[in-house]
């Protein structure tokens, strides 16, 4: 569990005092760096090695002062030495480092000064030893507090899809396919996210594969199966003689690891593919794209077009902002200086509920939950009056994934939607931890979204969530003009629009409007918004659809073109 930022700052001050007079690289570099990691409560020996031997481009051997594979390289110099040269020396080691072990950060120091390079963001920060305590948050990646900004077109999304896709193809080639393959890959994706987002310890999953499985891959599957069993077993129910490395993994719960799957099998290539997946920084992949990533893994033709097959965050926000977010944000601005009203508003946020009756992999639900949690974080800031020194436990974090409901006709997108909401919940918990300097995590998983695997057009939505308990309906149902509908879809439309003359010319998406209107009749306070074809508001469809909706009390609140 990460230390609080206040504790880290106190340790940084002591560290600066203790090392104020040190100057010799040869004499004290290792002790200095051990103490540096201790500032963040991380035993250096657990994550990083000294004097890592490396072969440089000129064929000579070099020795890296400290290497935390995939994360950090440190080059330590004596006081007064040139930090530019130290940085160049560090970069010269890179050709000899395996791709999956290439660090994101370089830190160079001469005891008196530190300079940190973030190679992915192209940024550098320099400060004196005495100012270390003011700069500890630069090292959130060590402490376990790192937060990430996401880019929808980030190349890591495509790279992740391609690497997981290759592993998917290999498993499928050996006959491991269908339901079991999909579940297996969801579990692997969860583990990959988990070790880069502080659900697991950093590199915990990768180290298990790298250190405990043979290079030929023969025992990789049994180790993974043992891990899945551990993740589904409470600490007090685990074997007393359980392998120590396996026993260090947390209890996850949440049903993701509950099903007993048939045995898989790995070879050298497949083990290497899994390690290649581990080498990516999965914290950079937003849970909002988790579902689309999974779908592209399952379909090779989608991998290069990741992003073309899901609704972008920009378009999701165009729907959810006028549906509920703008109104909530405006109310927050009006009351943020009134503590009692703010507390009541906080309770109100936790009572809001959301249904996506065509949820797919959950993109709309995930973004809606993220925005709800970000608003809750603003409420907590206002209640705390900007002081980030109090224990987060005294802030009742009320919003949770069980406020979200979905219906999805395909089984595994439904599973993905639930998993993606858990991942977003965890990442928002990390935002809270970062904000208030105390580690906040919800493990084992106690609550989950309600995602029904079924046909939304043949399902009574009241059986999922009662109308009187629902606040909003949202989503992106399938469109489908009359010439593109399947036999099943035609039957669904006929059942939904029974008695409506001419309904056969309507686009398929209109069936969700009719279902929503029927449902909302039991609670007129519900608001709904769907991504739709513009043809439902023009031409021959208008005279058929809208009289039917208007007589059911439907009013148009907003629309985008």
What is each PLM-predicted segment?
Residues 6, 26-34, 186, 291, ...:
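Short amphipathic alpha-helical segments
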Residues 85, 159, 508:
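Soluble or luminal CAZymes and related metallo-dependent hydrolases
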Residues 78-82, 97-103, 122-127, 146-154, ...:
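Short, polar/flexible loop-turn hinges at active-site or ligand-entry regions and domain interfaces
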Residues 104-116, 127-139, 399, 443-451, ...:
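Conserved beta-strand -> loop -> alpha-helix junction used to position metal-binding or nucleic-acid-contacting
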